[in-house]
Amino acid sequence: MNFRSFVWFLGRPALYPELFRRLGRSLTTPRTPRSHREKQKILSADWCAGNACPREDFLRDVGFQGEWRKVSEIHPDIWRRAGEIAGSCPVRMGGAGEVDLLYHLCLHLQADRVVETGVAHGWSSLVILLALDRMGRGTLASTDMPYALRRNDRYIGCVVPENLRDRWKLIRLPDRDALPKVLREWPAIDLAHYDSDKSERGRAWGYRRLWSALRPGGFLISDDIHDNLAFRVFSEKIRRKPWVLPARGGAYVGILKK
């Protein structure tokens, strides 16, 4: 951690637990060599490519019977406005990801309690809340820690309109502080979307927490599983065969059903 990041954390007392964790890791845990990280990414990408299946196969396997349409077609005005807001945001925080999948899975599950980690502009939050609004039920709990030194605090979830926020609990804390709070209140959840700490350590911790809270039949979805072997290792540990779906830009999404 550099000095500027340290000062940034000092101005945010709610993030002190994360500051202490990072300082502790910097003192006790050797930094993983870049060569190791690159090797892990190659191995993971190869595994993803070898296990990938079309979206249609996944939908058939889980018994999806609804009409598949893009969220941008179902809610064109909301989607267009969200794009304008994200486009005018001075901080770049990533794209929309596999939002259509999230939307339709919420409807398929008739989800009542959904948890996501990582919000950024709020694209995934938006589609989940649109699905909950369509059903007239349910709540989304989202966890997100602002990027250090990026000044993005005020833009977290910016694409989510006010009329959808009644069903939304946004907790602006790191996963290790926010998820225990959420899961104490919700011991059982229907759907979990992981898109925050991409390190192997962070994913292993988050997957374990979310999986333990999922109800039987619920789904754990993780973006960018090609980055490292964390998703593969976790799926083997719990002895579940995952669905691996190709995503935009050569990425992969992993899905596990409890």
For each predicted feature, which ranges?
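Membrane-proximal basic amphipathic "stem/tether" segments
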Residues: 1-66, 70-73
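S-adenosylmethionine/decaboxylated-SAM
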Residues: 2-6, 88-258
